[in-house]
Swiss-Prot record:
Sections of the chain in a coiled coil: 92-121, 608-905
MF-aspect GO terms: mRNA binding; translation initiation factor activity
Keyword Glycoprotein annotated: no
Subunit structure, interactors included: Component of the eukaryotic translation initiation factor 3 (eIF-3) complex.
Protein name stated in the entry: Eukaryotic translation initiation factor 3 subunit A
UniProt function note: RNA-binding component of the eukaryotic translation initiation factor 3 (eIF-3) complex, which is involved in protein synthesis of a specialized repertoire of mRNAs and, together with other initiation factors, stimulates binding of mRNA and methionyl-tRNAi to the 40S ribosome. The eIF-3 complex specifically targets and initiates translation of a subset of mRNAs involved in cell proliferation.
Segments forming domain PCI: 339-523
Domain of life where this protein originates: Eukaryota
SMART domains, alphabetized: PINT
Subcellular location: Cytoplasm
Keywords noted in UniProt: Coiled coil, Cytoplasm, Initiation factor, Protein biosynthesis, RNA-binding
Length: 1051
């Protein structure tokens, strides 16, 4: 059998509402449950599924079907948690609200049933909601017919309380360990705590605490799952801490001290995981509740330590608020009264710490001692202390912080009596008024009993130091307390027996003689033999008792110690070698220590460096591992999110395709039904009952319609043909008979028309006459009102005219004022615009004049620059010409000298003289190429060649005077320099002329190039500036800063 087709949520909701309307709520719940738990529901949109869930949880609450609600809510959470978390919160809040409303209604109903009884507490006496009917209650209901309040509550209220408890537990199970539903989870947990507190459900509170504890433990176990909570997140951890603090408060209110202590441990575990410190207000609550727990468990030592931590926290909060470093929201509000109260409780709780052991047995066994140490270590960690507290440490800390000044006067006096000026004979008389004041305070009354134990302990310890035996009556008289806290002799004897049993006291009671005998047997006290016999509160407190004198037992125990000390002192005085050996050993040890100190220090430093490196390496490794883990987790989460997104997209795509197919199918079916209806109503003779809509399509329907229309057309044509044939003969016969009666009918018609006309005419005349008479009468009645109307109209017209004139004149005045104002504004605006135009014109003229002046200055500068450039160019041309002439003459002299040397070697005649050489025409040679790049506007090689030719054609005297002029010219690095003028001229084979100038200093090639490539804007020293009589030419001036050509143009 195929599965039933999937129904839309809207149809399911409508069906359920119909069933509810006819009183079939269970059937409606079954329909909704089947739809919600169906796998096909996952593809339904959340917006259409939410109303179904709201009705579903409402029916579950009405019918108390918790299991069905749990199944449906689980399924709904899996559907909606990836798309819309808000709808889950709406449904669950509705579920809880309905359950709470049912409990309230059940309470009202129970009150109505038991209206004759007094109003009792809002909770029944059922201890466990999961075990309501016990055999005792069933037997009691059977044998007793009395209708009591408890029985009414058990029958009416308790089932709904159980359902509400199951509701909270179901919601917490659904929301657990889901980061997207975490806020709702914490809110539900707080509501569950309030439920337990309101109805005093201690058993359910224990189960709730265990449930939350398991959820936190499973959070770390399933941290790799999608949407898992992360306890490393500060916000998540803070929410869990808030929940645990509320759990602690409820546990203290319900006086469930074991659960409160476990809540303290949970809070301490969460605080150890937190990366940021907890708020001071939370820690103040933590220490306050911890102090109450220790007080209930009679652990007065850790109770006093908790009060000490609480006071320190209050002091730090007050200092932080005073310095402006914290906010009032994060720090508890502290007043002077609060500080006084806290200081008093710190001092009073420290005084209440027992001086001797409070354990019930001697406890000298190793396993018991180890268990006690482990317990103390746990409690110390809960308090956040480095080492276990002690009575002396707490007193020393209190005195250092000045608590005596802040404490109440009676507490200060109590401290002085017990710890400073303790006197056994007058202790009770001094402390009686203080105990009365303490007992009058409900909060301090709890410390009276431990204070009595401390007083009795001190009393017997000091009596044992002074007396060997005392009368019981004397002891009873010493141990007298105020009336509400009186101690009986039996209680004193019980205290003595417990102290002797634990080894803290060595007392024998003789009831026959009525005497207390303090044990003088030097071997009777086992206190020294059992180091673990004392409790944690008193193991180091024996020395704090005021020592009046040593007992015989103590003298016997210390005999060997005293003998050793005496012998040691005697040896020091009698035997010098003893001292020398000891001194030598001491010196040797000191020398070894000094020798090894430096090495040990270096080793310590090296070890410290190594430890630091290892720590850094471990930290780096841990951070790297955390980063890698976070990266892997992030990648995994991204992959899961992408896969989830892809799945949702695929599902959305499939749902869209299915919706389109369904819509197309629905439209097709509607069109087919519409066409069938049209066919049924428009075309006769078609039976559509036998037609299957599933197999029917548009083409077949069109063919059926056309066939039927064709059939109808043929039948109609046949009927028309038959009827026309019959009508032709009948109509001809009718018309022949009508011709005989037409004149008579015409005359009768004329007569009827005339009668009708006369009747209508008479009626019209009558109505007109009546209307005229009525109008004339109305005129006569209204004519009396015409003068009054005229006078009233005239009066109204005059008033309106006067008012109009007033308004017209006011409007004219306003118009004139506006007109004047407008004229003034226009004139002012025109004057301002004219001033602006004039100012603009002045600025424009000034700008034009300035631009013209700048242009003229620029042109003048440009002309000046061109003139300077032309002058410099002319100077350079002249200088190049002179240098070329000098070079030509030098070359000729070298050639003559070479010719003379060659003639001397060969024995020939001397070559012609210089004058003869000059007379010969100059032979044209190839131009000298200056391979050094030139910058500027220097002469070309053709110009230089022309200058050489002109110099060769000059007369001889000019050539003879050239060397004298040559000395006065500065050396140019850009042109040719003769060998005898260079720094290395002595290496030349030719001897320079005697009348030539002295050799100049060698200038490197790059400096010559830079000198030859200087811009024309640099100034040159004129040739006449160099003195002719100096041996060395004057040094060239320092090169000026180079200026770009565009800036030279601007200047």
């Amino acid at each position: 059998m195929p599965p039933p087709p999937h129904i839309k949520p809207e149809n399911v909701l409508k069906r359920a509402q119909e069933l509810i309307a006819v009183g079939q709520a269970p059937a409606a719940l079954n329909v909704l449950h089947e739809h919600v738990t169906s796998k096909r529901t996952r593809s339904s949109p959340i917006a259409s599924l939410e109303p179904v869930m709201l009705l579903f949880v409402e029916l579950c609450v009405d019918l108390r079907k918790g299991k069905a609600a749990k199944d449906g809510l689980y399924q709904y959470k899996n559907i909606a948690q990836n798309t819309n978390v808000g709808t889950i919160e709406v449904v669950l809040k509705k579920f809880i609200e309905l359950a709470e409303k049912k409990v309230t209604e059940a309470q009202a109903k129970a009150d109505e049933i038991q209206s004759s009884l007094e109003s009792a507490a809002p909770s029944s006496n059922v201890e466990d909601l999961e075990a309501i009917e016990t055999p005792e209650t069933i037997l009691l209901a059977t044998v007793s017919g009395e209708q009591s309040r408890d029985r009414t509550d058990r029958a009416v209220v308790t089932p709904w309380l159980k359902f509400l408890w199951e509701t909270y537990r179901t919601v917490l199970e659904i929301l657990k360990n889901n980061a997207r539903l975490e806020v709702m989870y914490q809110t539900t947990a707080l509501q569950a705590f309030q439920f337990c507190l309101k109805y005093t459900r201690k058993t359910e509170f224990r189960r709730l605490c265990e449930l939350l504890r398991n959820h936190v433990q499973n959070a770390a176990k399933y941290s790799a799952q999608m949407h898992a909570i992360n306890l490393s997140d500060p916000d998540t951890l803070q929410r869990h801490l808030d929940t645990r603090f509320q759990q602690l408060n409820v546990a203290v209110e319900l006086e469930l001290w074991q659960e409160a202590f476990r809540s303290i441990e949970d809070i301490h575990t969460l605080l150890s995981l937190s990366k940021r410190p907890a708020k001071n207000v939370m820690m103040a609550n933590y220490y306050e509740k911890l102090a109450r727990i220790f007080l209930v468990s009679e652990n007065y030592l850790f109770h006093a330590a908790a009060w000490n931590r609480y006071y320190n926290l209050l002091r730090q909060s007050a200092a932080a608020l005073a310095a402006g470093q914290g906010t009032k929201k994060e720090n508890p509000s502290v007043t002077e009264a609060d500080m006084t109260k806290a200081a008093s409780f710190v001092l009073l709780s420290a005084l209440s710490i027992p001086v001797i052991s409070t354990s019930r047995s001697r406890g000298a066994l190793v396993d018991v001692d180890e268990a006690r140490k482990n317990k103390n270590a746990r409690l110390t960690n809960l308090l956040g202390m480095a080492q276990p507290p002690s009575r002396a440490v707490l007193f020393r800390d209190a005195l250092n912080k000045g608590l005596l000044k802040r404490a109440r006067p009676e507490i200060r006096d109590l401290y002085n009596i017990l710890e400073v000026d303790f006197h056994p004979l007058s202790i009770c008389k001094k402390i009686t008024p203080i105990l009365k004041q303490i007992g009058a305070d409900p909060e301090m009354e709890k410390y009276v009993l431990p204070l009595q134990q401390v007083i009795l302990t001190r009393l017997f310890q000091q009596l044992s130091q002074v007396y060997e035996s005392v009368e019981l009556k004397f002891v009873y008289e010493l141990a007298q307390f105020p009336d509400p806290f009186q101690i009986t002799p039996a209680m004193i004897e019980k205290f003595i027996m417990n102290g002797c049993k634990k080894g803290d006291l060595a007392i024998r009671v003789d009831h026959t003689a009525g005497v207390l005998t303090f044990d003088t047997d030097i071997f009777s006290s086992a206190k020294a033999l059992h180091s673990g016999s004392a409790a944690g509160s008193a193991e180091s407190e024996v020395g704090s008792v005021q020592r009046l004198q040593n007992t015989p037992a103590e003298i016997a125990r210390l005999q060997l110690t005293r003998l050793a000390k005496t012998l040691h002192v005697t040896c020091m005085y009698v035997d010098p070698s003893y001292n020398e050996a000891r001194i030598q050993a001491k010196k040797a040890a000191q020398a070894r220590a000094e020798a090894g100190a430096a090495k040990e220090h270096e080793e310590t430093l090296a070890r410290r460096v190594l430890i630091e490196k290892k720590k850094e390496a471990a930290t780096d490794a841990l951070q790297r591992k955390q980063r890698e883990e976070e990266t892997r987790k992030r990648i995994r989460n991204q992959q899961l999110q992408e896969a989830e997104k892809q799945r949702l997209l695929d599902e959305q795509r499939e749902r869209e395709k299915k919706r389109l197919r369904d819509e197309q199918e629905r439209i097709r079916q509607q069109e087919l039904k519409k066409q069938l209806e049209e066919l049924k109503s428009g075309v006769k003779g078609i039976d559509i009952s036998e037609i299957d809509l599933e197999d029917l399509d548009a083409n077949r329907l069109r063919a059926i319609k056309l066939a039927q229309l064709e059939k109808e057309k043929n039948e109609l044509n046949e009927r028309i043909r038959t009827t026309a044939k019959r009508i032709d003969h009948l109509e001809r016969a009718f018309r022949r008979e009508e011709l005989k009666h037409i004149p008579e009918d015409y005359e009768a018609q004329k007569k009827r028309d005339m009668e009708l006309y006369e009747a209508i005419k008479a009626e019209t005349l009558k109505e007109a006459e009546e209307k005229h008479k009525e109008a004339v009468a109305l005129k006569h009645r209204l004519s009396r009102l015409v003068p009054v109307f005229s006078s009233f109209r005239k009066e109204v017209s005059e008033k309106r005219h006067e008012e109009f004139e007033k308004r017209r004149k006011a409007a004219e005045r306003e118009f004139e004022a506006k007109k004047k104002q407008r004229i003034k504004e226009v004139q002012e605006r025109r004057r301002r615009e004219r001033a602006e135009r004039e100012a603009e014109e002045r600025r424009r003229k000034e700008e034009e004049e300035r631009a013209k002046r700048e242009e003229e200055e620029r042109i003048a500068k440009e002309e000046e620059r061109r003139r300077i450039l032309a002058e410099e160019k002319a100077k350079r041309e002249e200088e190049r010409k002179r240098l070329d002439e000098i070079a030509q003459r030098q070359k000729q002299r070298e050639e003559e000298a070479e010719a003379r040397r060659a003639a001397r070697k060969s024995g020939l005649a001397e070559p012609p003289t210089r004058a003869a050489e000059l007379e010969r025409p100059v032979e044209r040679t190839a131009p000298r190429l200056n391979l050094v790049s030139r910058t500027g506007s220097g002469p070309s090689w053709r110009e230089r060649q022309a200058a050489k030719e002109a110099a060769g054609a000059a007369p001889a005297p000019a050539a003879a005077e050239a060397p004298k002029e040559e000395v006065q010219l500065p050396r140019r690095t850009g042109g040719y320099v003769p060998p005898h003028l260079r720094s290395g001229a002595n290496a030349s084979p030719a001897t320079p002329p005697s009348n030539g100038p002295a050799p100049e200093k060698y200038v490197p090639r790059h400096m010559r190039e830079s000198s030859s490539s200087q811009p024309p804007s640099r100034t040159q020293t004129p040739p006449a500036a160099a003195p002719a009589s100096s041996d060395k030419p004057e040094a060239s001036p320092a090169p000026q800063k180079w200026v770009p050509r565009w800036k030279q143009q601007q200047q």
